[in-house]
């Protein structure tokens, strides 16, 4: 199935990809992404590991309905998570560029 050098080359490629993925995952965990809701009145900043780093609430919202404020915070957090996931996909795509992976192959991230 594999030639003499084919399997060794495949294993070497897999090891290199694993090392690059590990490095990229460490870099991604350090990056920060900000999600917004309410036209920027609520901002939630998370890191690449989806840990919340900061929540900014415009002072004008402090007088408003508590339930609306909670909804906006949740929406901003969800927006931040979506942006973080998009960033992760872009960064990890650079790791696998040039590799002959089968169509539809899902990376473990």
Swiss-Prot record:
Domain of life: Bacteria
Entry's localization field: Cytoplasm, Nucleoid
Any GO molecular function: DNA binding
Major subcellular location class: cytoplasm
Keywords linked to the UniProt accession: Cytoplasm, DNA-binding
Gene3D superfamilies from the UniProt entry: Nucleoid-associated protein YbaB-like domain (3.30.1310.10)
Gene Ontology cellular component list: bacterial nucleoid; cytosol
Coiled coil (residue ranges): none
Family, as annotated: Belongs to the YbaB/EbfC family.
Subunit structure: Homodimer.
Function of the molecule: Binds to DNA and alters its conformation. May be involved in regulation of gene expression, nucleoid organization and DNA protection.
Name recorded for this polypeptide: Nucleoid-associated protein HSM_0308
Naturally occurring in which organism (per UniProt): Histophilus somni (strain 2336)
Lineage start: Bacteria, Pseudomonadati, Pseudomonadota, Gammaproteobacteria, Pasteurellales
